[in-house]
């Protein structure tokens, strides 16, 4: 099972990635984790990547793809892998294809933006303990106060409505075109000797368990 998980920030990809990982016994490959590991290990690609990161520059796609190919040679990828947060752009998807990185499924978790804004902007956090609440779905007993300590809850900057909207705008511009990219490739079939992935779209609305069952059904 070789899989790419797509969906907007706040669509619940992380939760479903954990279920898929456990069910199929495959590692979740995050480019952020991969970069940090390569830098820490001091591999040639890691040293090169560190130069860009230290200068506050984006690590070029060619270097990321090199790291991906190295990672996929490891023993835990023998039964497959799950890409989380990669590719983010058409250029990265093209680079993956040119590098011959095989993908069986592209699974999109679809949640309307209005729902994502409500989900994320309604989150409240108790900073000291990390306890989280939601003004609508999981409210504290006393509005704005932590259930255990009675201390004030905060809204993290990441969860503020304007921040969420900005993240969704970036997703719309950069990552959403991948949905069309993979959908079209699935229709065209094999290209350059690389089998086209099957494209599946599920609704990300409902309970965590309902979405999990939809995901498993889509990957049969």
UniProtKB/Swiss-Prot annotation:
Pfam family, one: ADK_lid
Region span, LID: 122-159
Location of the protein in the cell: Cytoplasm
Catalysed reaction equations from the record: AMP + ATP = 2 ADP
Sites where the protein binds ATP: 10-15, 123, 132-133, 206
PROSITE patterns: ADENYLATE_KINASE
SUPFAM superfamilies noted in UniProt: P-loop containing nucleoside triphosphate hydrolases (SSF52540)
Recorded domain comment: Consists of three domains, a large central CORE domain and two small peripheral domains, NMPbind and LID, which undergo movements during catalysis. The LID domain closes over the site of phosphoryl transfer upon ATP binding. Assembling and dissambling the active center during each catalytic cycle provides an effective means to prevent ATP hydrolysis.
Oligomer status and interactors: Monomer.
UniProt-recorded name of the protein: Adenylate kinase
Name of the coding gene: adk
């Amino acid at each position: 099972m070789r899989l790419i998980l797509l969906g907007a920030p706040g669509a619940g990809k992380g939760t479903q990635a954990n279920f898929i990982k456990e069910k199929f016994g495959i590692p979740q490959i995050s480019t952020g984790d991969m970069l940090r590991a390569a830098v820490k290990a001091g591999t040639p690609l890691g040293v090169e990547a560190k130069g860009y990161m230290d200068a506050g520059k984006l690590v070029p796609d060619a270097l990321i793809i090199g790291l991906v190919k190295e990672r996929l040679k490891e023993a835990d990828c023998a039964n497959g892998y799950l890409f989380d947060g990669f590719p983010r752009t058409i250029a990265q998807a093209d680079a993956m294809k040119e590098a011959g990185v095989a993908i069986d499924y592209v699974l999109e978790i679809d949640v309307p933006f209005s729902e994502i804004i409500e989900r994320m902007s309604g989150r409240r956090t108790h900073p000291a303990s990390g306890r989280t609440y939601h003004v609508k779905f999981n409210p504290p007993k006393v509005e704005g106060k932590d259930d255990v300590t009675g201390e004030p809850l905060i809204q993290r900057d990441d969860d503020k409505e304007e921040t969420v909207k900005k993240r969704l705008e970036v997703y719309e511009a950069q990552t959403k075109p991948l949905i069309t990219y993979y959908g079209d490739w699935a229709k065209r079939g094999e290209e350059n000797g690389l089998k086209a992935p099957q494209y599946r779209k599920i609704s990300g609305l409902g309970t965590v368990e309902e979405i999990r069952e939809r995901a498993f059904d889509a990957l049969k």
